Amino acid sequence: MLGRCFPPNTKEKQQLRMIKLCDPAESELSPFLITLTLAVLLAEYLTGIIANGFITAIHAAECVQNKSVSTSGRILVFLSVSRIALQSLMMLEITISSTSLSFYSEDTVYYAFKISFIFLNFCSLWFAAWLSFFYFVKIANFSYPLFLKLRWRISGLIPWLLWLSVFISFSHSMFCINICTGYCDNSFPIHSSNSTEKTYFSEISVVSLAFFFNLGIVIPLIMFILAAILLILSLKRHTLYMXSNATGSKDPSMEAHIGAIKATSYFLILYIFNAVALFIYLSNMFDINSLWNTLCQIIMAAYPASHSILLIKDNPGLRRAWKQLQHRLHLYPKEWTL
């Protein structure tokens, strides 16, 4: 997100200024790279919207048909809806900031985009963490009394935890307005027009940044990592046990366990990359036009799409529904020719 021009904060002793000396010749991307980046981002946004729209539609149809939705389906609906909104917002923001910078720079418009961006990102992080936690509780094989009690109550707790995550994300996004203020540092001409573009930086207090990082990103990140690692260890232990008792032929159950280990590992890697990219991007460590900042945007756009595709691929119900959809789409051209 672009920064805004505000008067420098007078309480300089209480502020940590993330100053990045901006040389336009060094930080501004070439027109070719800008076009390529926009094309990649657009492809990622559309892929993510389609994949998450499919997940939402399947579970909505399940809810209408069965008058209820499973706990995992409820989490997936929350996650998919937040990602559809997030990627639609990011696509709209790029369009407006590229075509009407003066309109985008208005206080109301800019803050609306910033609050929505932070809120939807944090919702997505929390929902994905709860999905990982739910799979861990339901699949992992531990015999501790507290764990067994949690497994028995998890389905009733999840709806409350999801709405609590929405409240935390919204409260935190509103709090971020006060710490993510920027001040105007430099300006340079835009070669394609007679106007000038300003370079902005953020002033974020150390305490606020720590709170911002820990509450918004680190807590769901730690929860996701712990749940994923414990699930992988449990599946690995059970896989080794089945392999020691195998008769020599391929065991479908063991192959399913191996597939679950791989899928969880992929989810973990994607989640970590996205969380790190989000923190770097929101912290304004690099200039808005730098290659590193662009890379963070690409990673943040790729995560919802790739994670949703893996969810469809590894979920039997979603995978079956996707194959049926492909089959129907394949038959439509034949029906039109008849």
Swiss-Prot record:
Disulfide bonds: none annotated. Residues 52-74, 138-156, 227-262, 313-338 are cytoplasmic. The keyword ATP-binding does not apply. Keywords: G-protein coupled receptor, Glycoprotein, Membrane, Receptor, Sensory transduction, Taste, Transducer, Transmembrane, Transmembrane helix. Glycans are attached at N194. Receptor that may play a role in the perception of bitterness and is gustducin-linked. May play a role in sensing the chemical composition of the gastrointestinal content. The activity of this receptor may stimulate alpha gustducin, mediate PLC-beta-2 activation and lead to the gating of TRPM5. Belongs to the G-protein coupled receptor T2R family. Most taste cells may be activated by a limited number of bitter compounds; individual taste cells can discriminate among bitter stimuli. This is Taste receptor type 2 member 39. It comes from Papio hamadryas. The lineage of its organism: Eukaryota, Metazoa, Chordata, Craniata, Vertebrata.
